[in-house]
Each structure stands twice: as structure tokens, then as C-alpha cells.
Amino acid sequence: VHRRAFVTGTLAALSLGSCCSSAPAAPPVTPGDDRFAALAGMCDGLAPIGPDERARRRERAQALMQEHGFSAIFFEPGDSLVYFTGIRWGRSERPMLYLLPARGPGAVIAPAFESRTLRERAGEDLAQHLWQEHESPYERLAEALRATGVGGGKLGVDPWTRHFIVDGARAACEVEIAPATPVLRGCRTIKSASELALLRRANEATKAALRAVSAHVSEGMSEGELAGLVHAAQIAAGLTDTWALVLFGANASFPHGTRGEKRLARGELVLVDAGGALHDYQSDVTRTWPFGPVSSAQARAWQAVHRAQTAALAELRPGRSCEAADAAARAAIAAAGYGNDYGRFTHRLGHGIGLQTHEDPYLVRGNRDLLAPGMTMSDEPGVYLVGELGVRLEDIVAITEGEPEVFGPRAGSIEAPFG
């Protein structure tokens, strides 16, 4: 790959990426908000994933590569890089790639001027194949393949890798390139005891934060103001990278929100979908509760969603399909009189969770993948009545050998939404 072709392809990819809209900024929060002091220390006592566990992950990946016919896999900065190496690195137009062969140690392909920074973050033992600014990083990738004894075969790529990098690698390496999904999914969907502990605590912390915030909801406050409190409470509990979606009344009939911000009035439902990270592992919790008197329509919708969540839990057992839980929840919503299919339960039941808030496995019609112990996912049915209300309840669930484990208390009733 000539340097000119590399630069041209990179610029084209960046110009396409600039068209994407960015998420709204988090509302300002006041550090050390005394209202949430009781949450302090919730996330203490758990260590991040260490180098020994990451080494076992790489060994597992290599076994899966051999099983599925991959000579090597590579990926750029992101969750897979963190998962296997612990290296955190931002993506830019300059490729930084990690190569893991089916046998032997991995290597990194990086800009030469970043070499010392890489050694600080990854240690001295990681082999580096460095490229100067006028050179092609993909030639260095081909060089790294030869150095690790991979002269041909199938090269796996993380599905989240940008297209211009895949194109550059394909042209320079002259090998078959295929998605490394069987390897990455085979490693990341089954959580270790350490991962489960982090996910459990993160979700317990978000639930405690939402309970604490509910005591400070007041008439006339805006969705953004309440979101700020949710951020502050989660930070007080020890989470990082917090986020919050707050919707009042009819705005909650948009599952992921609407542009018009609303102020809270008595008699409306409050929907909060929130989360954060504990040592990179995510929480994702939704609660819906009333502010003031509860109408019969609100109570009926809330109860239907709670029953649907319970019906789905009964299907979250090892050996059952991902689509079975979605079907059970959808049947419960229909039985409550809210129509079949996607009419008022407009989205899939759930998604996997780990380093990413949304990852495999997905609980959706057509996904016949089988559940297995160690998988973690959301159980989040909803009912959305346009122009009137929205109700969603979401808990993170771990598949076990028997009954599923729900991380933190489930909602008890519309009057006791925090368990």
C-alpha cells in the first residue's frame, strides 16, 4: 500500500465519520453533593481485571482461533484491546493495531513517535512494529505477520474495526480477512467471576443511586436537572463515565427520548435509564415511577411491563434460545391488551452487557443462539403509548446453572419501584 493511497483512504473515512451527530453533553454536576454522601464507598473493595486474567483471555482466544481456522486476529483501540491487553488508546487517523497470532505472543503496530508511551502502558515485553509518518502502517502489519510465523491463512478482524483499516490490511497482507466474531464472542460473552463481581456491584450502585435521587424529585424540575442529580449520585457511589436518560410523562413514549425537554408535573410518570462504569464494566438500569397520584392507565401499563419482565426471567435459563425470552415478554404484553408484535412494545427485550453497554448476546426474535452460564444481559420490556406515557423496567441478569441472578433488587410495584 503506497503512502499516498493510505492517506487518501484515511481522509475519506474521516470525512464520512464527521457527518455523525454527537451525543448531548452530560448536565453539569456538583462534585461531593452532600445529598448523596451515604452512597460513598459502594464500589470500594473490588480490583480491576489484572494481567493474569488477561493472559488467560489471550490463551482462550488462541484456542478458539485454532478451532475456527484463524492464523491470527487483529484489532484497533477499543473494548477488545482493553479486554485482551488492558491498553487504553484513542482512535485517530493514525492506525494503532494489536496482532495476536494463533500461537505465540502478540505484537503492536504503532506510530514510531508513540513507542515510549506504549511501553509505559503495555510494558517492555510487547513487541512493537513501528512506522514513521511517511510509511504505511499496513506494511508493518504484514511484517508483524511474517515475524510471528503467519505467512498465510485467515486473518481475523474485530467487527468494530474501521473500513479503511480493513481495506489497507487486505491490500498489504494478501491474506483472507474475515470477521473474528467466533473468537471474540467466544471469549467475551462468558464472564469470569471477576467480571461478574464488577457488573454486579456497578448495577447495585446505579440502583442505589436511583433510589437516592427519587427523594429529591420536585414539581417543575426539568429532565436535565434530574439527569444532573442522577450523574451526581452515581459518581458519589463510585462509578465513572456515568450517563442518564430522564423522561417525564408523554416524553417517555419515545423510548430513547425526544428533543423537547419537559418540566415535571404532578400525576406524571418519571422514567430514568442510567448507568456508569466500574473498572470498565457497565451498569444499565431503568426505573419508572409516579410523581403524585397514580392513574389507572399508568398502573395498568406498569403492571403489564413488570409481568413481562417476570415472564422473560423464566426463560433466561441455560440451553434456551435468546429469542425465547423476547417472545415470552411480548406475549405477556399482548395478554395485557397492548397488542401483538412491536405495536406498543417497540424494541427488542434486551442486550448483552460487559465492557460495552450493548454487546452480545441480544434477546431478540430470530436469535436462536443458546444461553449459557456466565452470560449477562438486560431484561427490559416496555409499553409506550404515544402522547400519553412510557413505562420501562430494566435489570441486568446473569445466566447461572439454575435460576438467573438479577443484579440488585427488582422493582416491587409502582408504589415501590426500587424493591
Question: For each predicted feature, which ranges?
Answer:
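Active-site neighborhoods and metal-handling regions in enzymes and metal-associated proteins
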Residues: H2-G419
